[in-house]
């Protein structure tokens, strides 16, 4: 099992954007030190509200790569359906070369109808647009060239500069946003990053479908390493841990799930993430990782208000990782 971090960068009431971003920067600078055994860090993409204030995760990743020496850093969910695939290929290739292969490209379909409309994309062909975008940018990364002649893009063969030095070895992950995306990823043998806001049952359904489709298409998934994002808030007082998590995710849940029982959704997520006392999270987290075939666990400590306690918890997790190396 490999461990990394992910950052949602929610700006809660009373917080400044500087404080939110500084928290991410300081945490990554801490775990980049040689004595830490976290391997990766990922930045979430979100638009138009404070429920995630980074709209350009690859830009944030470029700063963090320049700040660090050891960690592999990338986008958690760079949305490709609403961005031009050539620009993504160019940026990914540049970051790959400048970071000496430490950049990770996490990709996603769009999960917001408003964003699809805002960026003038057609909802009824969303899956096809996602797939077309991926083929273009992946060609650019792996062959240094790409062209398009489809329903969405039409341009002659062009060169991607600078060339991506990692090419097919540039690590890619696909956010599990729908069953269609999961089935497509399985056919290509691309690893998934599960959504933190999906229930465990939804994640498990995606994993089982991934296994089925991969088998039907004779795809070898021996080395596929799915990623499980885990929200963490550990406190000697479980009530404090749970309330801090409620306060942290409530705004996003209200925005992303307007037609559900939001309080019920929040309580369900609290049960399925690492929230409570030190003795309460291990078995449930281990069970979730097994049920989703996850080989990587990504941790977010952002809901914890006591930053000294966050450092202590990171150090505790690091010692446990070290003992199991």
Swiss-Prot record:
GO CC, alphabetical: cytosol
Gene3D superfamilies, per database record: Luciferase-like domain
Gene Ontology MF annotations: alkanal monooxygenase (FMN-linked) activity
GO annotation terms (biological process): bioluminescence
Source species, domain of life: Bacteria
EC number: 1.14.14.3
Keywords carried by this UniProt record: Flavoprotein, FMN, Luminescence, Monooxygenase, Oxidoreductase, Photoprotein
Family matches, as Pfam families: Bac_luciferase
Keyword Cytoplasm belongs to the record: no
Catalysis performed (reactions): a long-chain fatty aldehyde + FMNH2 + O2 = a long-chain fatty acid + hnu + FMN + H2O + 2 H(+)
Physiological role: Light-emitting reaction in luminous bacteria. The specific role of the beta subunit is unknown, but it is absolutely required for bioluminescence activity.
Family recorded in the similarity comment: Belongs to the bacterial luciferase oxidoreductase family.
Subunit description: Heterodimer of an alpha and a beta chain.
Name the record gives this protein: Alkanal monooxygenase beta chain
